[in-house]
Amino acid sequence: MARLIKGIDTKLVHAGEPEPLIGGAVSMPIFQSSTFEYAGQTSYHDLRYIRMSNTPNHAVLHAKLAALENAEAAIVAGSGMAAISAALVTVLGGGGHLIAQDCVYGGTHDLFVEEFPRLGMTVDFIDGDEPATWREAIRPNTKAIYVEAISNPLMQVSDLQAAVDFAAENGLVSIIDNTFASPINFRPAEIGFDLSIHSGTKYLNGHTDIVAGAVIGRAELVERITHTQTHLGGILDPHACFLLHRGMKTLAVRVRHQNESALKIARWLEQHRAVSRVNYPGLEGHPNHLRACELFDGFGGMLSFELEGGLDAAERFVERVTIPINAPSLGGVETLIARPANTSHLGMSAAERARAGISDGLVRLSVGLESSDDLIEDFETALAID
């Protein structure tokens, strides 16, 4: 009898798992083999070889990721940037033009402005809150629109449904980076996005021990992206596949805890006299709060804030806290703290960061699984020193 797999918690544990179990192993084994015996395949891309991303470890992940977002297909990659690169090279091709949200992850921004020109591709940035202005950015060679579910690092929520509708009206591919939300809080295919991209390094894995990426969406597009990735080589090795697969099984438990803790911490920061601004879509005063409520099942574990003392106060705060680790990245079990100006968005010039609203004193917090009460007490102590 087929196993009943409906809810997302059940999908995390059972979707895509081999039936029958391989050798009876309850935990998916690692297939640490670069190649597999020829079995009569007639297509190059069907040959069983790690670079084709078609080992048993890859296949389980692809099926599980597609099931989580109620999408048609998925492919894992060697990093989040490998996933973004393979997707955009495929969709834009030679000479394609992209319309992108103006506040994005620093690595994505650098790809757009530094590498795109070398590949004959171009980008124009748009205000994600102003759909009426997007048409001005369209060119004859525009191929896609790119947004983030929750922007990094200002936690903005663009008009995502408008992005989907705009793409459909203009024959574009709609692409979203869903890393900050995760499939627990948002499933882009359900509102019509063609492609959803993740840095699997973050929430999907959740244990800060691998680098990985994923593209989820329409089967025809994912197949093309898979072929591109095969040629570019940005694949995920079987051991990393195993760690990603293991981490995903606890995704719901982790993300729901992080949702709850981040909201509690954001509300506390919002009331503190030393804090001038808190960016978290779960706060009623956030400009995109109502939109986030309509779209998401939770508001995520990421927030950012500014202190009254600006850069100096931010540097002192980051040095004084004792629980958060001062490091880039996010989505793990440990709370991480960083200033985007000298980590995730260091590749942007000061002028570019200023235009994006990213001050040098902005502090970004990735809330982990520690006690939220302990974190708040730690923050209170660090702020009280001044």
Predicted feature locations:
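Conserved N-terminal alpha-helix of the aminotransferase class I/II PLP-enzyme fold
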Residues: T35-S85, G107-E115
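Glycine-rich phosphate/pyrophosphate-binding loop
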Residues: I30-F31, A39-V60, A67, L336-G361
